[in-house]
């Protein structure tokens, strides 16, 4: 095993500094929770709703109205999983249609607590092992920023199944497992937990990994059928109908709805809404400008990712596999809003990149910035009284208009644009240097012919994967 080259001087001090800032944000969030009774912004603004995604989903895993009453977008696997790792008697079936009926189980279902936090710790160990395998020098800083950063902490506070799906994602696409079949299973599990993670699978076709994609799709279908047979509900039509309905409901009606997000969808909804006087606050000219400028930036970044995908198809052997996956994943995540915690997915792949080239360096630094659990207040709203779960009492909460909801989606877009441009540059340089003389190096994927060029391409891909 060769010793990795020493990282450039900027990386030696900058990454530890950024990780230290992330640690400071974690300490501040913990201090605020202890002294004020709730987590500060940018965490969710309802202090009583901690772990709500886990325990409400666990309740509806037992209520037959999962898809027609609660209108969930989760495939059956999520509910089967929560049935297996929860106490049945903690979830008596309630009358009515209370979407938060599972919150009462938080004081009873201790296996749920243990499972959620166990997967959180498992993720920390997995990402450290993966990054140590790639570059031991930067591994501690990147692993800490990802495992203890804002996206993962937000997922933990919400009790969202991103914590479990993330485990499946890193085992499917990280370098820890050697068995391709086992990787297929974890890829199928990840998709059955979070449907949009299919965007991490299809980019493998750009690298001509036909059998890998076929195996993962078969595993996905088999896992779905088994979980559907267990749960007894959750047909593809029900899931698709609920996803379409959910997308129609996304938006913002007040400034508090501009919370922790990955895209500008909520802001655009608020700008175009007649329920909130944004024109009176920033002026009609600025509103009209933002309604044109923000979509233009989004479309530009989406086009750059598509162009990068085309470039990968032409020169698949010169682009690292983790970046190929990330391009498809980021295209999905910037196109449809799925929550701020989903940033953990693409940050995982960004931190696999080497500290080389302006675009990649920017993406790495920006990923650290997204991991900082802090925000900058711009203005203050009136204090309100809210119930809190820790402590079990009512508290006075001061809400602020923060900078984060306006800046974080832009940082996400710059990361996507940076890796797209870095990919286009890599392909362009290879085309100028080598022309088309070795274009048959991937021919064995189509015909049973192995050439020296094909072997060279496979070796280069393996080196990139390491």
Name what the model sees in each region.
Residues 2-182, 210-340, 399-400, 426-442:
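Primarily membrane-embedded glycan-assembly and transfer machineries that use lipid-linked glycans
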Residues 307-312, 340-356:
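Alpha-helical transmembrane segments in multipass membrane proteins, preferentially the mid-helix core
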Residues 70-78, 350-457, 466:
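Aromatic-enriched
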Residues 181-205, 327-334:
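Membrane-interface alpha helices of multi-pass inner-membrane proteins
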Residues 69-71, 169-175, 192-199, 245-249, ...:
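Juxtamembrane/interfacial segments around transmembrane helices
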Residues 161-170, 195-198, 215, 342-351, ...:
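Hydrophobic core segments of transmembrane alpha-helices in multi-pass, intramembrane catalytic enzymes
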Residues 87, 204, 351-352:
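Active-site catalytic microenvironments for nucleophilic, acid-base chemistry
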């Amino acid at each position: 095993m060769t010793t990795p080259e020493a990282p450039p001087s900027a990386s030696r001090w900058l990454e530890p500094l950024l990780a230290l800032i992330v640690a400071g944000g974690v300490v501040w969030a913990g201090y605020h929770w202890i002294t004020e009774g709730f987590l500060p912004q940018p965490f969710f603004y309802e202090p009583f709703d901690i772990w709500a995604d886990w325990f409400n989903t666990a309740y509806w895993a037992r209520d037959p109205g999962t898809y027609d009453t609660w209108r969930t977008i989760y495939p059956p696997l999520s509910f089967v999983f929560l049935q297996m790792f929860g106490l049945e008697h903690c979830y008596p079936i309630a009358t009515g249609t209370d979407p938060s009926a599972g919150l009462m189980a938080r004081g009873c279902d201790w296996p749920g607590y243990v499972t959620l936090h166990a997967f959180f710790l498992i993720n920390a160990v997995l990402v450290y092992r993966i990054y140590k395998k790639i570059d031991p020098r930067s591994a501690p800083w990147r692993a800490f920023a990802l495992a203890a950063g804002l996206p993962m902490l937000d997922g933990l506070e919400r009790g969202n199944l991103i914590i479990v799906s993330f485990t499946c994602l890193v085992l499917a696409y990280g370098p820890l497992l050697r068995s391709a079949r086992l990787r297929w299973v974890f890829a199928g599990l990840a998709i059955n937990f979070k449907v949009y993670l299919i965007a991490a699978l299809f980019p493998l076709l750009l690298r001509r990994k036909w059998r890998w994609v076929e195996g993962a799709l078969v595993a996905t279908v088999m896992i779905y059928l088994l979980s559907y047979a267990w749960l007894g509900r959750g047909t593809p039509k029900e899931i698709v109908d609920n996803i379409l309905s959910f997308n129609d409901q996304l938006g913002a009606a007040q400034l508090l709805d501009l919370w922790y997000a990955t895209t500008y969808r909520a802001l655009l909804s608020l700008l175009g809404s007649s329920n909130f006087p944004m024109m009176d606050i920033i002026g009609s000219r600025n509103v009209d400008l933002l309604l044109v400028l923000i979509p233009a930036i989004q479309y530009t970044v989406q086009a750059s990712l598509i162009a990068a995908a085309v470039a990968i198809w032409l020169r698949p052997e010169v682009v690292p596999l983790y970046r190929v996956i990330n391009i498809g994943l980021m295209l999905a995540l910037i196109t449809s809003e799925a929550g701020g915690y989903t940033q953990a997915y693409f940050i995982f792949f960004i931190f696999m990149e080497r500290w080389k080239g302006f675009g990649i360096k920017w993406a790495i630094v920006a990923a650290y910035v997204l991991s900082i659990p802090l925000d900058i207040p711009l203005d203050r709203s009136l204090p309100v009284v809210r119930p809190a779960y820790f402590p079990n009492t009512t508290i006075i909460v001061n809400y602020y208009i923060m900078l984060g909801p306006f800046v974080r989606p832009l940082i996400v877009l710059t990361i996507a644009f940076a890796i797209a441009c870095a990919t286009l540059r890599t392909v362009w340089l290879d085309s100028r240097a080598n022309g088309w003389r070795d274009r048959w190096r991937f021919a064995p994927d189509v015909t049973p012919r192995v050439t020296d060029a094909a072997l060279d391409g496979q070796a280069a891909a393996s080196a990139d994967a390491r």
